[in-house]
């Protein structure tokens, strides 16, 4: 198991990772659990790139395999976003500061959209992004 990867990069579709995979130096390919991982260097960083397939379940499964097998310090999801804001154009880079479960709705029970319950623990409506990583991405 390798533990020296700074970034794990996940994309849902081939066209979301192809350019990054093509730019890898010292590229190595590994197949695990039905997934193909591309290892190498992007600029000065050791990275592992993987296509997860579309959907939250595929993303979650692939993220767990990525963590278990390669232990990246940071995980980045790259890809195509839907038309959320008319001020955004193709090629724009969006860096999130927080996220919600957009498709999880318990408002009928008096809670905010995205509010989560896991066991007896109440989860926050918003999950905050890592501030250090957010700042690095802006550079």
Task: Outline where the language-model segments fall.
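Glycine-rich phosphate- or other oxyanion-binding loops that anchor nucleotides, phosphorylated ligands
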Residues: 2-6, 31-139
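Short, conserved "active-site rim" segments that organize catalytic pockets and cofactor/ligand binding
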Residues: 4-24, 46
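Short glycine-aromatic motifs
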Residues: 23-31
């Amino acid at each position: 198991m390798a533990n020296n990867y700074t970034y794990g990069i996940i994309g849902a579709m081939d066209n979301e990772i192809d350019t990054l995979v093509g730019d890898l130096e010292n590229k190595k390919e590994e197949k695990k659990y039905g997934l193909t991982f591309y290892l190498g260097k992007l600029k000065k960083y050791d990275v592992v790139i993987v296509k997860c397939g579309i959907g939250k379940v595929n993303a979650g499964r692939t993220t767990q395999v990525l963590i278990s097998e390669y232990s990246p310090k940071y995980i980045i999801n790259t890809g195509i976003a839907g038309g959320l804001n008319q001020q955004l154009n193709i090629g724009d880079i969006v860096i999130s500061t927080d996220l919600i479960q957009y498709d999880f709705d318990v408002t009928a029970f008096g809670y905010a959209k995205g509010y989560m319950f896991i066991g007896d623990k109440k989860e926050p409506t918003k999950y905050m992004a890592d501030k250090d990583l957010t700042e690095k991405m802006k550079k």
